[in-house]
């Protein structure tokens, strides 16, 4: 590991602090809680949508979330290690065959749906038995 990678690792460790970043991929529906500053107040705003891309690497990694708000498509790019991103929650896992889902921009309504990834039987049996 060279010096730059080592510095990146140290910075990622300090920026994550106590929060955990879940394992997610394009196609997953995410709920991102973002810190919003309004005047002197600071509050959390939830942004829920489909992850359509992940880009970059290391400390520069970011992801794009797309949602439909009042009939208009809205995309927002979040840096993964930003202090403004409070938490990321995976709402559901999607089954896709592409790393970049930019084709969703041209689809409307039911055509833009992503099928949910099915869990394997051993995992569902464990949760059912508990």
UniProtKB/Swiss-Prot annotation:
Family: Belongs to the bacterial ribosomal protein bL19 family.
CC per GO annotation: cytosolic large ribosomal subunit
Coiled-coil spans in chain: none
Alphabetized Gene3D superfamilies for the sequence: 2.30.30.790
One GO MF term: structural constituent of ribosome
InterPro entries: Ribosomal_bL19, Ribosomal_bL19_CS, Ribosomal_bL19_sf, Translation_prot_SH3-like_sf
Name this polypeptide is given: Large ribosomal subunit protein bL19
Any one GO BP annotation for this protein: translation
Species of the source: Parvibaculum lavamentivorans (strain DS-1 / DSM 13023 / NCIMB 13966)
Keywords, in A-Z order: Ribonucleoprotein, Ribosomal protein
Protein's job: This protein is located at the 30S-50S ribosomal subunit interface and may play a role in the structure and function of the aminoacyl-tRNA binding site.
């Amino acid at each position: 590991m060279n010096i730059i990678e080592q510095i990146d690792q140290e910075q990622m460790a300090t920026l994550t602090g106590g929060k955990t970043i879940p394992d997610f991929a394009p196609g997953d529906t995410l709920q991102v809680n973002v810190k919003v500053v309004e005047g002197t107040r600071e509050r959390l705003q939830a942004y829920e949508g489909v992850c359509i891309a992940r880009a970059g690497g290391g400390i520069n990694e970011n992801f794009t979330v797309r949602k439909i708000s009042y009939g208009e498509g809205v995309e927002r790019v979040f840096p993964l290690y930003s202090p403004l991103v409070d938490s990321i929650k995976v709402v559901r896992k999607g089954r896709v065959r592409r790393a970049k889902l930019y084709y969703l921009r041209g689809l409307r309504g039911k055509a833009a749906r992503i099928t949910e990834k099915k869990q394997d039987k051993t995992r569902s049996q464990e949760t059912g038995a508990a």
